């Protein structure tokens, strides 16, 4: 597929300062390693003052990085999934659709490498980063987040049958045709789960690539959001096709 036909969305909620630190190395890494990938920041209901400040900073960066698009925003917090879908709607011609978290926990080089891998693929597939210490990658996580992630992913394996060690890593890339074939419902953090479940139902391979990761303070995944994620997983099991359980 044409390298230029890739759109990377960065959903951001109260994350402007870390995002502005992340954008220059990200833009440079994409130019050097993944062709002309368009980058679309979507601000998911951050305070108005932050939205104005961030829009001005992005406008300045666009002078050096034309692939960085004007910022999108809306006044109310609607959730990560809603922000991603809002951004993806801006490029109906893109062959590949990607997203990455705004905090810069995923190194820019890892984002570029995964996008380049997808662009070089001979067959459609979902590509996602996974954070695992069982590789030569450097993964630094806060202890409570590490334990919570293990518990959640084990529960997802049992409840939804998704055989992945890390469903919630904020770096994923999917083919546009796959995205266009479904009506998407999850607006929050459960968008990742919906994506993987729909890929399984469609028979689309999922390629998991170990990545380096460095946890950043100030995560927006609160205990309330985690409970909502468990509730969404229950809802998804009721509403989406499940794999066969026997012969």
Locations of regions flagged by a protein language model:
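Short, well-formed alpha-helical segments that are part of the catalytic scaffolds
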Residues: 15-30
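Hydrophobic helical membrane-anchoring modules
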Residues: 1-4, 11, 184-247
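Short hydrophobic beta-strand elements that form part
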Residues: 7-11, 40-41
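Acceptor/aglycone-binding surface of glycosyltransferases and processive sugar-polymer synthases
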Residues: 74-78, 82-91, 96, 108-178, ...
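Short beta-strand/loop segment that forms part of the nucleotide-sugar
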Residues: 35-46, 72-74
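Donor nucleotide-sugar binding loop of glycosyltransferases
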Residues: 15-19, 46, 80, 104
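A conserved acidic beta->alpha catalytic loop
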Residues: 43-54, 104
């Amino acid at each position: 597929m044409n390298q230029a036909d890739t759109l990377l969305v960065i959903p951001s909620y109260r994350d402007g300062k870390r995002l502005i630190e992340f954008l220059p190395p990200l833009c440079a890494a994409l130019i050097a390693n993944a062709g002309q990938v368009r980058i679309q920041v979507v601000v998911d209901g951050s305070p108005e003052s932050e939205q104005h400040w961030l829009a001005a900073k992005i406008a300045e960066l666009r002078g050096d990085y034309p692939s960085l698009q004007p910022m999108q925003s809306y006044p109310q917090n609607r959730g990560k999934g809603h922000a991603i879908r809002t951004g993806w709607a801006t490029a109906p011609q893109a062959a590949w659709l990607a997203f990455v978290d705004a905090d810069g926990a995923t190194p820019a080089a890892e984002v570029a490498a995964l996008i380049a891998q997808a662009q070089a693929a001979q067959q459609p597939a979902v590509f996602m980063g996974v954070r695992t210490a069982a590789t030569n990658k450097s993964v630094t996580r806060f202890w409570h987040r590490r334990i919570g992630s293990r518990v959640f992913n084990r529960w997802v394996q049992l409840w939804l049958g998704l055989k992945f060690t890390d469903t919630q890593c904020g770096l994923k890339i999917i083919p546009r045709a796959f995205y266009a074939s479904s009506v998407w419902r999850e607006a929050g953090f459960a968008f990742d789960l919906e994506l993987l479940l729909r890929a399984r139902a469609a028979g689309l391979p999922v390629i998991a690539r170990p990545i380096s990761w460095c946890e950043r303070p100030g995560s927006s995944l609160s205990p309330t959001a985690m409970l909502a994620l468990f509730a969404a997983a229950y809802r998804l099991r009721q509403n989406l096709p499940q794999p066969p359980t026997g012969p």
